[in-house]
């Protein structure tokens, strides 16, 4: 069936309405991909948005629910399951794990990061980093219903740490 993805600042209720409209038109939708506004984007939409130490606008990478759009994420994903939808969230992980993100503390403890309060670079090429990332950052989202991830990589083409390694594999 149909996959839906659009870069738009949808709320959970707007997505429910959208799926209802598709169903009323007999559009056989199977997959709902929620673009980046599921997470906090802070000043991302400003013309002169501040950049982080990785050269990305603050809010480009994110792992903290934007509660004004998704006040009850688990409830939303439960609804998606009742609608037989597979769901994905958009990721732009170039800025690693920032200290202001909800999963930061879990991640740094699992990874063994010793520079507390400092961002942890994106190091998917490192097994220990990848394990901590999947267990403590992505895992909690999957437990509430995220089926898969849309890695929307738009930064540098190769790893800054492993020669010739594509960031999208």
Predicted regions and their residues:
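Aromatic- and carboxylate-enriched substrate-binding clefts and catalytic-loop regions
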Residues: 28-169
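An acidic-aromatic substrate-binding cleft motif
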Residues: 1-12, 29
């Amino acid at each position: 069936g149909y996959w839906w993805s659009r870069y738009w600042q949808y709320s959970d209720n707007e997505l429910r309405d959208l799926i209802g409209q598709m169903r009323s038109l007999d559009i056989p939708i199977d997959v709902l991909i929620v673009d980046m506004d599921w997470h906090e984007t802070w000043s991302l939409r400003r013309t002169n948005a501040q950049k982080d130490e990785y050269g990305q606008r603050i809010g480009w990478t994110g792992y903290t629910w934007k509660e004004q759009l998704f006040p009850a994420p688990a409830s939303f994903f439960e609804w998606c399951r009742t609608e037989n939808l597979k769901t994905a969230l958009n990721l732009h992980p170039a800025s690693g794990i920032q200290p202001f993100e909800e999963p930061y503390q879990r991640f740094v403890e699992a990874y063994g990061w010793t520079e507390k309060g400092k961002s942890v670079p994106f190091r998917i090429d490192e097994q220990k980093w990848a394990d901590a990332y999947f267990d403590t950052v992505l895992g909690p989202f999957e437990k509430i219903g995220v089926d898969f991830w849309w890695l929307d990589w738009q930064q540098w083409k190769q790893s800054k740490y492993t020669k010739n390694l594509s960031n999208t594999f």
